[in-house]
Amino acid sequence: MKQMLEKAKELVKMLQAAVDEEQQVQLSTLKPRDKFTTDIGEFIVLEQLEGQTKVITAKLFKENVRFDDSSTDYKKSELKKLCDTEILQEFEKVFETDNIVEHAADLTTLDGQKAFGTVVCKVRPLTFDEVRKYTEILSDKELPDWYWTCTAWSTKERGWEYSVAVVGPSGNVSDDVCGSQYGVRPFCILKSNIFVSKGE
């Protein structure tokens, strides 16, 4: 009886592996809006580039996270430290380190100031310009909370020392102080020749 049970378990495992393999597709074949599943949640394709794919988590990856105690400069923020350590490590376990592309992001403020320059990283929140570009894809009224961008609203010199742009579930954008707590919906760029499990 015990042997039969073990054989049944082994058969179930083999069938599951076959199903998983059948659902595997090359990331480059997915279109914007398409979803794929991983051990850490579902991702949405935002854009296909030559050999690379821009993706974002379908849901909030973390909740109740502070941007920073006093800075709206993403490069100096607590949120960047979280993305560069804990979140990146979780992504690397799923996609492998070499498949996550390091890239530069423009930290121009919402009102067009260049005070914060650019940031180079692998995993981060979207910028305001990216939120605007992908707004039709990002909207999800089922999200439980707003989420951070890495874009400051303005600067101290213009009277906005602590404000950062945040995105609502329906895609609307507002500002709040950096010390508030919101969700994190990480963005990254992956090599598009990897294989993923296509979602429904």
At which residue positions do the language-model features occur?
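Short amphipathic alpha-helical heptad-repeat segments
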Residues: M1-L5
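Collagenous Gly-X-Y triple-helix signature in extracellular proteins
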Residues: E6-E200
